[in-house]
């Protein structure tokens, strides 16, 4: 039985990458060592981390005046790191279109009790269960603010922000954890981008930060480990980095490049998601909780049946049929198909076939 992994993260990785990692597990390029055990100061690992940065710069067209960092702590640590480094004595705006954006804002509010800055809720769609991406008037933003924080893809709710809003000249800080390398964004539109690896980059353990030089803090942050300038000056080697996760990330970047790069990856992702959205649209049995088609994520597609009982039955039968981790997040319910870069189109077609049979067997 073929297994299709719909996990929202950690997520499916490219098979060629896993096979290469397997082949190099005990002896990386005749070094006599596994990447798991080699020094992060060795010439072998120095080449790995430099190649990873070079490839990511090439794929995303990252300008020279941005630094690329490979950090630890997941994207959630960035919720604290961002205000600690960027927001002292200033306003910081938060665009909240999903659960992760809310967590970023909540953490900022918590930090504002101990460091001097003012987190402001710019817009939120929480009152309608984050079923759409809210808009805002740029004129309400203080041009002297530190940043506007937004999330480009809402993993749980299945919405995404493709058109970057006007923020009245204030730098945008973007959480791209679940659609980095999936769709094209212009790096120049952002002051900072960050992403946890475990969706489209590699295994959990490394967090990518892309930050404009002028945003590197001039004053020390609360902790050296949480200081962007210290991390940048140390070239992500202030302490022992998540070496193996960076190694896998480098191979994922190579894989994306081999398939034609980011633009070709976006074409493939829109094809995959389009197949599933089209099927849901023509069905009277399945529903999408996302209100506006323009807000639909290409990476995470939630859907429901007519009842919670049928949702539970669907998940149980789908799991037995090889469709793993398709249960929706507990805050949304239903099902969620996460179609990250490494997820094959064949899996989408197989899921649609299963959905069609389930609908025929369970329609009133």
UniProtKB/Swiss-Prot annotation:
Q: Which top EC class applies here? A: transferase
- Annotated localization: Cytoplasm
Amino acids binding L-glutamate: 41
Q: What GO biological process, any one, is recorded here?
A: L-serine biosynthetic process
Recite the UniProt keywords alphabetically: Amino-acid biosynthesis, Aminotransferase, Cytoplasm, Pyridoxal phosphate, Serine biosynthesis, Transferase
The principal localisation class reads: cytoplasm
GO CC terms of this entry:
cytoplasm
Task: Point out residues bearing the modification N6-(pyridoxal phosphate)lysine.
Answer: 199
| SUPFAM superfamilies hit by this protein | PLP-dependent transferases
The protein's required cofactor(s) are namely:
pyridoxal 5'-phosphate
Q: What is its EC number?
A: 2.6.1.52
Q: Which Pfam families match?
A: Aminotran_5
Q: Which family does the similarity line name?
A: Belongs to the class-V pyridoxal-phosphate-dependent aminotransferase family. SerC subfamily.
Protein name per UniProt: Phosphoserine aminotransferase
Native source species? Streptococcus uberis (strain ATCC BAA-854 / 0140J)
Q: Which gene encodes it?
A: serC
């Amino acid at each position: 039985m073929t297994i299709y992994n719909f996990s929202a993260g950690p997520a499916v990785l490219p098979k060629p990458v896993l096979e290469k990692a397997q082949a190099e597990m005990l002896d990386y390029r005749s070094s006599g060592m596994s990447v798991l055990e080699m020094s992060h100061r060795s010439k072998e690992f120095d080449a790995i981390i430099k190649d990873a940065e070079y490839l990511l710069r090439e794929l995303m067209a990252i300008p020279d005046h941005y630094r690329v960092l490979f950090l630890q702590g997941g994207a959630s640590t960035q919720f604290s790191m961002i205000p600690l480094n960027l927001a002292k004595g200033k306003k910081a705006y938060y665009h909240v279109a999903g659960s992760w954006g809310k967590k970023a804002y909540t953490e900022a509010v918590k930090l504002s009790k101990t460091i001097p800055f003012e987190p402001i809720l710019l817009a939120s769609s929480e009152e309608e269960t984050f079923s759409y991406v809210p808009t805002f008037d740029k004129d309400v933003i203080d041009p002297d603010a530190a940043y506007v924080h937004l999330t480009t893809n809402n993993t749980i709710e299945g919405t995404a922000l493709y058109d970057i809003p006007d923020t009245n000249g204030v730098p945008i800080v973007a959480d791209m954890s679940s659609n980095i390398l999936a769709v094209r964004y212009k790096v120049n539109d952002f002051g900072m981008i960050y992403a946890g690896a475990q969706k489209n980059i590699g295994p959990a353990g490394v967090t990518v930060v892309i930050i404009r030089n002028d945003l590197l803090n001039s004053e020390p942050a609360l902790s050296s480990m949480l200081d962007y300038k210290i991390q940048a000056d140390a070239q992500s080697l202030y302490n022992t980095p998540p070496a193996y996760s960076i190694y896998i990330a480098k191979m994922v970047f190579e894989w994306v490049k081999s398939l034609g790069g980011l633009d070709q990856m976006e074409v493939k992702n829109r094809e995959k998601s389009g197949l599933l959205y089209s099927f849901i649209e023509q069905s009277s049995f399945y529903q999408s909780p996302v209100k506006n088609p323009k807000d639909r994520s290409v990476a995470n597609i939630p859907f429901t049946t007519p009842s919670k009982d049928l949702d539970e039955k669907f998940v149980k039968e789908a799991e037995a049929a090889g469709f793993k981790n398709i249960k929706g997040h507990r805050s949304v319910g239903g099902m969620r198909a996460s179609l990250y870069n490494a997820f094959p189109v064949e899996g989408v077609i197989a899921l649609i076939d299963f959905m069609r049979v389930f609908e025929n067997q369970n329609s009133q």
